[in-house]
Amino acid sequence: MMIPNVFWLVPIASIVALAMAYYFFTQMMKADEGTPRMKEIALYVRKGAMAYLKQQYKVVGIVFAVLCVLFAFMAYGLNVQNPWVPFAFLTGGFFSGLAGFFGMKTATYASARTANAARESLDAGLKIAFRSGAVMGLTVVGLGLLDIAIWFVVLNHFDADGLISITTTMLTFGMGASCQALFARVGGGIYTKAADVGADIVGKVEADIPEDDPRNPATIADNVGDVAGMGADLYESYCGSVLSTAALGAAAFGVAGLEVQLRAVIAPMLIAAVGVFLSLLGIFLVRTKEGATMRDLLRSLSVGTNVSAVLIAAATFAILYLLGIENWLGLSFSVISGLAAGVIIGQATEYYTSHSYKPTQQISEAGQTGAATVIIKGIGTGMISTCIPVITIGVAIMLSYLCANGFDLSMSSESLAHGLYGIGIAAVGMLSTLGITLATDAYGPIADNAGGNAEMSSLGEEVRHRTDALDALGNTTAATGKGFAIGSAALTALALLASYIEEIKIAMTRANVAMENLQGEVISAADANIPDFMNFFQVNLMNPKVLVGAFIGAMAAFLFCGMTMEAVGRAAEKMVQEVRRQFREIAGILEGTGTPDYGRCVEISTRAAQHEMIIPSVLAIIIPIIVGCVLGVAGVLGLLVGGLAGGFTLAVFMANAGGAWDNAKKNIEEGAFGGKGSFAHKACIVGDTVGDPFKDTSGPSLNILIKLMSMVSIVMAGLTVAFM
C-alpha cells in the first residue's frame, strides 16, 4: 500500500529529536567540570555507573537470547506467531537499552558541571541540569519514533496481510522494550537504593555525618543515581501508547476502507511527531532568576511543560482535521482529556510531595514526636494521595471513550471500537510532550548528584545552598514525573488490553478456529467483533476464571513490590556491614585523613542488583503465560484488569509517600522544626530511608509491570489459543 507523504514527518521528527539531544549533550560537555576534586568525584561516579551497566546488559542479554529462541520456535516451529516477532522483540530491547545507556552517560557527565555552574548562579545550574535531562527526553522520543517508523516501512513492504497484522506485529517490539525497561528499573533501583539506605543508616544516623560526605564509603555508589532505568521506562510507555493506538485504529476503521484505516493508524504517530517540535519549544522557555524560591523554580519548569501541552492540544485539532478522520473533533477532545489528566496528576503529585504545601509540612512536624509518627503520617499521606489520580484517570477514560464514539453508550461493536481508539489517543496525547516532561523527571537525579559533588568537593555554603534548591526542586519534579509516568501507564495498559483481543483474533484466524457470534451463528474469527469475543470467551464478572485472574493480577502487584523491597533490604544490610567494617578497620576515615574504599561499595551494589533483579523480573513474564495456559483468554483479561487496578493505585501510593518523606526531611534541613541535627531531623531521616525503595525501586517498577504483563499476553496470544 502507498504510505501517505505526511507520514515522513515521523522519521524527520525522530532525527530532529536525536540531533537536538546531541546538541544539548555537546553544549553540556563544553561547560567546565570544576576543580580537580570535583572532576575526581565525577570520575568515581562515572566508573561506578558504567561498571553497573556493563554487568546489567550481560544479564539482560542472556534473558533476551533465551526469549528470542522461544519466540523463534513459536513462530517457525509451532506456527502460532508472526515470523517477524523475534526480530521486533530484539529491536525493542536494543533501542530501550540504548535510551537507558545515553541517559546514564549524560547524567554522570552533567552532575559536576551543574555543581560548577551553580558557583556562578542558580540559573546557570538549572539550565545545565535541565538541558542535560532534555538529552534523555529527546533521545527517548527520537529512538522511539525511529523504531516505529522503520518497522512501519519494513512491514508495509513485506507483510501483505493488511494493517491489522502490521500494527499488531509492531506491538511485539513493545515487549522487548518492556523487558529491558523492567530489568533496568528494578536493577537500577536496587543498586542505588541499597547504597542510599546503607549510606543513610551508618552515615547520618550512626556516625552523625552529613549526606554525601566523602568520609562515607557508600556515598559514591549512592551518587550513581536514580536515572538508571528511567529512560527505558518511559520509552516503552511512549512506544506502547503509539503502537496500541495504531492497532486499535486499524481495527476501528477497518470497514471504512484502506485509505481511512491508514490515516487512523498514522494519526497517533503524527501527534507524537508534532509533540517533539513543541517539546523543544518548551525546553528553551525554562529559565529562572537568582535567589528564586521553590515556587519560582517550579513555575519556571511549569511554563515550559504547560506551553508545550497547550500547543500540542491545538496542533491535534489541525492534525486530525487535515487527515480527514471521522469524528476528528471528538478525537481531539480525547487527546485533550489525556493531556489534562497528565497535568492534573502532576499538580496533585506536587501538592502531596512538595514541602511548599501542607501534607509534607505535616510530616516534618510529626518528626518532633519521633520516627514512628513520621512513618504513620507518610503512609497516610501516600494513601490519601491516590484519590485524585484515580478519579482523574477514571474521568479521562470515560471522556476519551465517549468523545471518540460520539457519546454512544450502546456498546455496539462500532461504538466500542471507536471508543477504545479514543482511549488510546488520550494516552498518546498525555505522552506527546514526553520530550519535556521526561526532561523534568531526569533533571532530578542530575541535580541530586550535583549536590553530592558539591558536598564531597567542599564547595562554599552559597553553592551548597543553590544545589540544595535545585535538589529540592528535583525531588518534586521527579515525584511529578513519576505521577505522570504512572498515569500514562494506566491509559497505555488499557489500550493494550483492547489490543490483546485483536491479537487473539489474529491467532484464532491463523489456527482456523470457528466461533459463535452473539446471534448464535457459527462464523470465522476473522469476521467476529469485540462483543462476539467477549461472549464467546464468557468475559463477565460471573465467570470464576475472570475473577481468579483479577485476584492474581492484584496479588502480582503486591508480590512484585514485596520482592523488590526485600531485595533492597538485603542489599542494604550488606552495604551497612561493609561501611561499618571500613569505619572500624581503615584508620582515619572519620577524621578525614584516611581514604574509604569506594570501589568495594560499588561492587556490592552492582552484584546485589544483578542477583536480586532476576526473579521479580522473570515473574512478570511467567505469570501471564501460566494464567493464559490454565485459565484461557477470560483469565488473562481478568489478570490484566486486576494488575492494572491494583498496580496503578499501589504505584501512586508508593511514589507519593516516598516523595513526601524525602521532602519532609529537606524541609527540616532548610531550618524548620529545629533544622539539621535536631530530633525531628533524625526522625525524618528514618522516614526518608524507608521511602527510598518506595519511590525509586518498587513504585516506578509497577508502571512497567502492568504494561509488561499486557505485552507478554499479546505476544503469547497464539500459545493461549493453542491451549483452548
Show the residue positions of the predicted features:
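Hydrophobic packing and interface segments
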Residues: 1-724
